[in-house]
Regions:
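Core nucleic-acid recognition elements
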Residues: 1-174
């Protein structure tokens, strides 16, 4: 029986300054209390078995690209992830590259985007604002919204490296 694990690796900044400003203005029309928007890519890596330290370092090197992400203590966090049951073109190419670099234990590499909002003072998003902002942050044809509360994320240690284990939990309709 295979030992398949899905790793969650934080990555680079997802949006340019221009795109961040444009998106922030759209979000501020929904909720004027939002003062800052940061974004970063998250890589989800399906692995069959454990990676050696060398394999893990190679994987990190391959997935190290772009500007360093800005990490702050955000008030609200949203995720846009590929639709369940689909394989994005980015995932196909990234998985090919990883395999060509000799990482045969890696079954698939996928990329999502984490958006972090900072609100003024003690402001909190209302449910209708949260829903409207989630709609702005993802393209429903190829991505679906998520948030930290909609995903189970736990810290773990694997071969001396701190990684996040990511499991998608589906919310059931009543």
């Amino acid at each position: 029986m295979s030992n398949t694990t899905q790793l969650r690796l934080d990555a680079s900044r997802a949006l340019s300054d221009f795109r961040t400003e444009r998106l922030l203005k759209k979000i501020q029309k929904i909720c004027p209390e939002v003062v800052t928007l940061n974004s970063r890519y998250i890589h989800f890596v399906n692995v069959d078995g454990a990676l050696s330290s060398e394999e893990f370092h190679t994987l990190e090197s391959i997935l190290d690209y772009g500007e360093e992400a800005i990490v702050t203590a955000s008030t609200e966090r949203f995720m846009a992830i590929p639709r369940l049951g689909t394989i994005s073109p980015w995932a196909s190419k990234a998985t090919d590259i990883v395999h060509n670099c000799g990482l045969k234990k890696v079954l698939r590499v996928e990329r999502g985007t984490c958006y972090e909002l900072i609100l003024k003072g003690n402001a909190v998003l209302k449910p209708e604002e949260r829903e409207a902002i989630a709609a702005v942050l993802h393209d429903r044809k190829c991505r679906e919204p998520g948030c930290e509360s909609g995903h189970r994320v736990c810290r773990c240690k694997r071969q001396g490296h701190a990684v996040d284990r990511y499991r998608r939990t589906r919310q059931r309709s009543a």
